[in-house]
């Protein structure tokens, strides 16, 4: 049985986020606003079905998917692109590949203790985020 990501997570670390957004061609005003936010993550997992809600005072983003099945992801509100996304298990980690206009786009997510780690990648730029489980 894979690890269970279910829970409510508060952001502790947001390293290199503005550079990540720049690599996605997000305009400077939105980058500055987004860099000030400390979004929470609410994750509901039922086997290989996952709903990941990224919640902030500025904008919310919901990702609803089945692990191992490719789907079209609408990134309106992030960088206004669509991509074909596949999330797969790699041991106890979730690996995401987002195929679209930007090369090398995706993320890896895993748990260490009571912390959720998220590494987002695009065109060689890496953003590292850490969240603490609060419930």
UniProtKB/Swiss-Prot annotation:
Residues 22-32 are annotated as: Important for interaction with STRA6. GO terms for molecular function: all-trans-retinol binding; fatty acid binding; retinal binding; retinoid binding. Changing residue 59 to E: Decreases cellular retinol uptake and impairs retinol storage. One of its GO terms (cellular component) is nucleus. Gene3D superfamilies: 2.40.128.20. PROSITE patterns: FABP. It comes from the Eukaryota. All-trans-retinol binds at residues 41, 63, 109. GO terms for biological process: fatty acid transport; lipid homeostasis; retinoic acid biosynthetic process; vitamin A metabolic process. Changing residue 41 to L: Strongly decreased affinity for retinol. Further decrease in affinity for retinol. Its main location: cytoplasm. It is found in: Cytoplasm; Lipid droplet. Keywords: Cytoplasm, Lipid droplet, Methylation, Retinol-binding, Transport, Vitamin A. Interacts (only as retinol-free apoprotein) with STRA6. PANTHER family: FATTY ACID BINDING PROTEIN. Cytoplasmic retinol-binding protein. Accepts retinol from the transport protein STRA6, and thereby contributes to retinol uptake, storage and retinoid homeostasis. Forms a beta-barrel structure that accommodates hydrophobic ligands in its interior. This is Retinol-binding protein 1. It comes from Homo sapiens. The lineage of its organism: Eukaryota, Metazoa, Chordata, Craniata, Vertebrata.
């Amino acid at each position: 049985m894979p690890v269970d990501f279910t829970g409510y997570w508060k952001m502790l670390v947001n390293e290199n986020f503005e550079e990540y957004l720049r690599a996605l061609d997000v305009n400077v005003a939105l980058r500055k606003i987004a860099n000030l936010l400390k979004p929470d993550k609410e994750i509901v997992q039922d086997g290989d079905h996952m709903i990941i809600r990224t919640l902030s005072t500025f904008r919310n983003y919901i990702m609803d998917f089945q692990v191992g099945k490719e789907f079209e992801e609408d990134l309106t509100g992030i960088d206004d692109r669509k991509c074909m996304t596949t999330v797969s298990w790699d041991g106890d980690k979730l690996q995401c590949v987002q195929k679209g206009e930007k090369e090398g786009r995706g993320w890896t997510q895993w748990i260490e203790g009571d912390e959720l780690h998220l590494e987002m990648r695009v065109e060689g730029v890496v953003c590292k985020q850490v969240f603490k489980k609060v419930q």
